[in-house]
Structure formats: structure tokens, C-alpha cells
């Protein structure tokens, strides 16, 4: 298991692995799924971490750099989705919450630009047949969604989408 986490100390995203210590592995997993302003930073080896997705939401270039020739990207947002710039009011919240972590604040503020640039790059790769993307065809659920019926319906959509796309995906992998 390789988790992407972001550290104030590292400034950039960082990939962490753990094969020996289950408690440390749990901390890495918690950090890689943390939500700014909602969950606290996770201390790993004395260093505070947030979700590395703040620095690189879809690490496609990392996958390519590692030499992966067949890449399947699973997105949680519909075709064409782009992140909006954070409002001034929310920027103030981030500045206050992470005033001791200016690099984290800068990373959070740049996130929409980096994300949107990555989505444009993914669109180009997909058009050229260089990657395979699975994405929902229905409205995605909120990150804070708690209603079991809504979550189950989105899960079912993903399950049936995968059933329909399996053959197409296998053709991509075999070419």
C-alpha cells in the first residue's frame, strides 16, 4: 500500500509506505484521507500531515514517471468538472486554521489550478487513448454525505458502470 500524504515540512506531496507497524500504517491512512478544516492534521513520526491530494489530487504524472504504460484513472467527478477558486471568506478560514503552516495554505490555495490543469491533461491523454478513465455519469455525492440510501445509490451506479465498462477497459489493457 502506498499512500499520498502532504507535509508542511516537505512542502510537496510525499508517498509513504508501511509494512511493519500497523499503528503507523493507520496514521498514514488517516492522513491520506483527512479533510482540511474538518479533521485535524495527523502526526506521523513527529511531523504533521494532511491529505496529499491537496498537492496532487490525481497523481498521473507520478504514475507515468514510475514507468506505468497502462494507467486506469478512477475519478469521483463527472466529465468536465473543474474546481472553483476558493472564495475570500474560505481563504480567511484556512489562513486562520493553518496560520502556523503557510506552505499548507499556499498549497490549498493553488489546489484548484493544479487540479484543473491535471484534468485538462487527463482529457488529452484519454482522447489519445493513452489512459483509461472511469468516471460517474450521475451527480456525485458530497464528501460529507451521510444518508445511506444516497451513498448506496452512488455505489450501485459505480458498480453497474464498471460492469458495463469492463470489456472496454480490458481492450485498452490488451492493446
Model-derived regions: residue spans:
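ATP/pyrophosphate-binding catalytic subdomain of soluble kinases
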Residues: 17-19, 27-65
